[in-house]
């Protein structure tokens, strides 16, 4: 039988829960620094509210990234100097950096191994405070205390300076940051009425892959609570004293202040993806009459309410830290991309407008989003159970994106396609929400979009992913074409076997929506496609085995070989990827062999901490028996519940929670695997 997904969710959701009382501040359990030695650009952003656009954090290595991790890391807890504080942190989006300094003016951050060559400053971990909604640190080289907090669309900075005539604020706008890709243009102006305003145009790597020629633009409008004594512009290392504006790659601005001892200089910076004018509007609507301390309190209260929707009982203090820190990170992602007036960045580069209610407020918000690949193990259930209003917004936003571009996008950065792994589970997410009773969106349009995502191959752009879905629909599986490497075409894929498994699962999900809506012919087609995975089941090895373009199983099959037909994994890991038809998988393998194999998988994998061991590398576990450091088989510890030995699910879930997850900067979400 196939109807086990809800049970999987419950077992997965309760495995690591632990105790707290209603009186305890739940934010005290959150440690944003967990896992920050090997995380992505948007992972460490403590100065933010749930799903906010303004995500403020220090950056220690700009866009250089973690050589043994994934994309740009931004903040690496092993580093000892900070180059500034960025205001935008999102998947494939980053920039607008502010840095306080004292003394001789420098306009480039300098390298990690030589902080004195630029304006970056050393810091000590003991001087850091990172909490939900707040961050502070002492910049040792300058004796400046930096503090950050935020509303949804406004970043608040507060810098406490020593007594000096050379207190500086550096606005580094035209320099590459995070996952944003190369800067194509930038502009910053110190206006006559005392605002600092501008924009930066970037070309993220995934945008270049999935929507070539498109760019992402970030806008800002900032106000200060102190008057500078001097100002100037710069372009890289070249400075222009007294100038109020600069445009181009490397553009920036500096302001100089005469400060008394412990004088605070406050900065409010409104953000937008549509225009400077809307950044200014966001600033006025969200920050008018509010000071730093008030916003910090409000941010903390917002986090308390959000975290408090899930209260847990039993267990140890470290379990509570793991649980609420994980929940904190789940609520940070997929931040706002629309303004207070409902303006949003459309896929074609224009500015779209969300409908307004009778009071002139947008009827929903619009979001950036990392890919949904793997989010169906956790986020989609979390949203529907505890944050249904966000699920509503996310679905409404998907409908807008679909109408704008004609296809669903798995990952979206400023409305541009950033599919990530080149598949697309948005149709599954729409169907899942509908099946959970989340229906405050255009259901007919949602079904049309989901159906097209599962069945539509004609004219499919790269950004919509699933380029090989036509083959899956016509013959029930995607052919493995090893010559493609990591690419996918309409003829097949280098990841054909994992695609077949994934498309089978998503077809099943949309089939359930089709049946509920009375689309019986669609239901029958999708239900049949949901069994496509079985075409790849090899009765000899009892593993999922790729088939070539002629329909034959590939020769010289090695079930432990990673990337050979399987994206970020191997046949040993992916064979369990049949969450919609577990009973049939158990039947094909044989119940006793299934249980023995699965139990042995965990026994062996425990030696490598259920992943890639202690190697700091996002893909360290792709060759392993089991890789809890990546999405494809996060669910398999629950499968004993459907093979007659539920106590083994209890045993291995608890062991994974105790040993794979940690409360340290390196040992957090594994020892160095993919934190997503």
Question: Residues of each region from the PLM?
Answer:
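C-terminal motif of bacterial Sec signal peptides marking the signal peptidase cleavage site
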Residues: 18-19
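Accessory carbohydrate-recognition regions in carbohydrate-active enzymes
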Residues: 22-428, 434-501, 508-535, 541-544, ...
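Bacterial N-terminal signal peptides that target proteins for export
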Residues: 1-9
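Short, linear, compositionally biased motifs with a strong N-terminal bias
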Residues: 14-15
């Amino acid at each position: 039988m196939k109807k086990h997904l809800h049970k999987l969710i419950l077992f997965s959701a309760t495995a690591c829960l632990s105790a707290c009382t209603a009186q305890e501040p739940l934010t005290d359990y959150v440690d944003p620094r967990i896992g920050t030695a090997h995380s992505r650009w948007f992972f460490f952003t403590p100065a933010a509210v749930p799903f906010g656009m303004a995500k403020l954090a220090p950056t220690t290595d700009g866009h250089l990234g973690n050589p043994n991790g994934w994309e740009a890391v931004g903040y690496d807890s092993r580093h000892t100097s900070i180059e500034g504080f960025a205001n935008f942190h999102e998947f494939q989006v980053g920039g607008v950096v502010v840095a306080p300094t004292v003394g001789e003016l420098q306009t480039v951050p300098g390298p990690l191994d030589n902080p004195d060559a630029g304006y970056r400053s050393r810091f000590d971990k003991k001087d850091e405070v990172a909490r939900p909604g707040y961050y502070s640190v002492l910049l040792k080289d300058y004796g400046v205390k930096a503090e950050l907090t935020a509303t949804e669309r406004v970043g608040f900075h507060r810098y406490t300076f020593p007594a000096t005539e050379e207190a500086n604020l550096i606005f580094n706008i035209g320099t590459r940051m995070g996952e944003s890709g190369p800067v194509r243009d930038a502009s910053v102006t110190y206006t006559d009425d005392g605002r600092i305003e501008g924009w930066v145009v970037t070309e993220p790597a995934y945008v270049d892959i999935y929507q070539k020629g498109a760019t992402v633009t970030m806008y800002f409008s900032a106000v200060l609570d102190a008057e500078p004594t001097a100002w100037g512009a710069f372009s890289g290392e070249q400075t222009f004293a007294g100038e109020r504006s600069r445009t181009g790659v490397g553009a920036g601005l500096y302001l100089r202040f005469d400060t008394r001892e412990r004088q605070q200089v406050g900065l409010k910076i409104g953000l937008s993806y549509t225009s400077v004018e809307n950044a200014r509007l966001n600033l006025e609507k969200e920050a008018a009459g509010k000071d730093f301390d008030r916003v910090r309190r409000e941010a903390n209260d917002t986090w308390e309410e959000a975290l408090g929707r899930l209260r847990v009982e039993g267990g140890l203090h470290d379990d509570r830290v793991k649980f609420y820190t994980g929940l904190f990170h789940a609520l940070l992602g997929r931040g706002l991309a629309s303004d207070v007036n409902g303006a949003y960045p459309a896929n074609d580069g224009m500015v779209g407008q969300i409908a307004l209610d009778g009071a002139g407020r947008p009827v929903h918000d619009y979001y950036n989003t990392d890919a949904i690949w793997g989010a169906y193990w956790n986020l989609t259930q979390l949203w529907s159970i505890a944050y249904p209003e966000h699920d509503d917004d996310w679905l409404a936003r998907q409908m807008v994106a679909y109408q704008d571009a004609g296809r669903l996008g798995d990952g979206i950065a400023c409305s541009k396609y950033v599919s990530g792994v080149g598949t697309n589970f948005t149709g599954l997410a729409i169907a899942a929400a509908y099946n959970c009773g989340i229906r405050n969106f255009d259901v007919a349009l949602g079904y049309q979009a989901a159906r097209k995502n599962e069945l539509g191959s004609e004219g499919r752009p790269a950004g919509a992913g699933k380029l090989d879905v036509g083959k899956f629909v016509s013959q029930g599986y995607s052919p493995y074409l090893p010559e493609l490497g990591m690419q996918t075409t309409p003829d097949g894929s280098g990841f054909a076997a994992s695609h077949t498994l994934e498309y089978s699962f998503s077809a099943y999900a949309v089939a359930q929506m089709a049946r509920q809506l009375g689309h019986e012919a669609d239901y029958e087609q999708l239900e049949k496609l949901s069994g496509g995975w079985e075409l790849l089941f090899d009765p000899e090895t009892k593993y999922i085995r790729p088939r070539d373009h002629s329909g034959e199983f590939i020769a010289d099959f090695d079930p432990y070989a990673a990337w050979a037909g399987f994206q970020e994994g191997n046949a040993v890991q992916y064979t369990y990827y049949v969450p919609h038809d577990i009973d049939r998988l158990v039947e094909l393998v044989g119940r006793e062999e299934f249980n023995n194999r699965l139990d042995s998988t965990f026994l062996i994998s425990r030696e490598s901490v259920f992943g890639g061991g202690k190697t700091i590398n996002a893909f360290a576990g792709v060759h392993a028996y089991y890789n809890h450091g990546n999405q494809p088989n996060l669910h398999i510890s629950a499968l004993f519940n459907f093979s007659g030995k539920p106590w083994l699910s209890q045993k291995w879930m608890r062991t994974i929670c105790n040993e794979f997850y940690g409360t340290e900067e390196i040992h957090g979400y594994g020892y160095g695997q993919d934190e997503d």
